[in-house]
Amino acid sequence: IVTNLKCTLAVTAGLCSSFAYAQKHPHVILIMTDQQRGDALGCMGNEAVISPNLDRLAGEGTLFMNGYSSCPSSTPARAGMLTGLSPWHHGMLGYGRGASQYRYEMPRMLGDLNYYSFGIGKMHWYPQKALHGFRGTLVDESGRVESPDFISDYRLWFQMQAPGLNPDSTHIGWNDHGAATYKLPERLHPTAWTGEMACEMIRNY
């Protein structure tokens, strides 16, 4: 784990216990990181970044050297992944609030094909607990609270794991211009939590 990199979205879908069913419905795991340059990977020749797991995925799969996002801002890029549409068609031309539901949403379409889809990590949707076709979510919204009754799943977990510690004490934010080593135990990092929750979801489905 690169400790100053936050995982924004881990989607697990098609987690089927039946081998025959799984043969027809392959498992799908989509991992999306937040605010990461395309060359910030060891497999891209960047010696400053240690990313063995992502490097292995790239080595065993397909590495797109000319792939690009239709919008470099996080929320419209996420809306593009969710809907398969360009910013001009899903309606988010820049950073801001997206729709609470879109006409076409990938998790809902997977559900129509009998997949069980679940979203884990930073969603940055509005409302914050919107499902967008997922059967359920576990969200990390950092300190962003847009309704008085909301607290992110990561924050609840952090309070149980590290009572008395403040997750904001690292002073590393999503939109900061600087980077730093995570000062708390690595197991408390949002990316570590996202990965562990995704693995637990797969194990227990």
Describe every region a protein language model picked out.
Residues K6, L15, F19-Y205:
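Formylglycine-dependent sulfatase
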